[in-house]
Amino acid sequence: MTEQPLNEPVLGYSPGSPERNSIIQEIDRQMSETIEIPCIINGEEVYTGHTIPQVIPHNHGHILANVHLAGREEMESACSAAVDAQRSWIEIGLEERCKIFEKCADLLAGDWRMRVNASTMLNQSKTVFQAEIDLSLIHI
C-alpha cells in the first residue's frame, strides 16, 4: 500500500449535527425518486425490460427502484465478461490494485458516505449506526 491507512472518525448523528442533517437530506432525496437499476455486464448498462420493484422493507408501498432481471443470455454474457476481466486483473500489479481499492475507500469515506448509508438504511431497514458498520466492512 502507498501509505498507512487511518480509521475514519465515528459520527454521532446527534440531533442537529451536520451528519444528522446530511443523512436526513440524503434519505429524502433517495425517497423522492424511483430509479431504474440495470444489469451491469462488462461495464455496460443492460436494461432487460423484465423488472421487479425494490421496496422499502418497512414500507412496502414505497418503491425505491425498478430492478432489471438478468435472463439466460445476460447471465452467460456476464460470466464470459467476468472471466475476461479476471485475466486482465491478474496482470495488474499489486501496487496498482492497492491504489484502486484505496480510491474506493476514499470515496466511501467521503462523498459517497451518506449516499451509501442512506441506501443501506432504506433498502435493509437498518439504523444509521448499523449502516455505518456495514460501510466500515466494505473498507476491509
Language-model segments: residues:
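Glycine-rich loop-to-alpha-helix module at the N-terminal edge of alpha/beta enzyme cores
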Residues: 49, 55, 61-138
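Hydrophobic face of amphipathic alpha-helices that form TPR/SEL1-like repeat modules
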Residues: 1-64
